[in-house]
Amino acid sequence: MFRPVWFRTWRYLQIDIETNGEPLQINRFSSEFTAYPLKENAIFESDQSGLKKIWNVGWRTARLCANETYFDCPYYEQLQYVGDTRIQALVSLYVSGDDRLVRNAIMNLSESQFYEGLTRSRYPSANPQIIPPFSLYWVDMVN
């Protein structure tokens, strides 16, 4: 069994196996779904089925982009960018009422402040990056 230390995100899986002419039987394949355990407490109703599908995709995305922190995407960087985090925090609060990740994000970003008050654009991260307007998003989150 292969189980990575950190989760891997995928939609499709291609397995290339060379058997050198020997028969191959895959007895079992499984994967585990991982997402932050936000509960959907808000209700979205519409007589347009397409809008309900958009709601479902958006809510699934919100859950997939949250784990120990909020992050920009579950596939690539997995970094908590302030610009994305503010939107994700509002979605979490409005739909679930769960404020744990919101409070965590506010504290994380507070810890990222430089001496002049600007926050890093993404935190926690080993590589400091500053996008000045993102500091204002953090101020808006605290307000």
Give names to the regions the model predicted:
Residues 1-53:
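Extended acidic/polar, glycine-enriched regions
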Residues 3, 69-82, 123-135:
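Solvent-exposed loop and edge beta-strand segments that line ligand/cofactor-binding
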Residues 8, 39-76, 80, 100-108:
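Low-complexity, Ser/Thr/Pro/Gly-enriched N-terminal "stalk/linker" regions
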Residues 18-28, 51, 93-106, 113:
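Structural helix-adjacent loops and short alpha-helical linkers that scaffold large soluble proteins
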Residues 28-34, 57-67, 108-119, 138:
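Active-site-adjacent bridging/hinge elements
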Residues 76-96:
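Extended ligand-binding clefts on enzyme/binding-domain cores
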Residues 97-143:
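Helix-terminus loop motifs that line ligand-binding clefts
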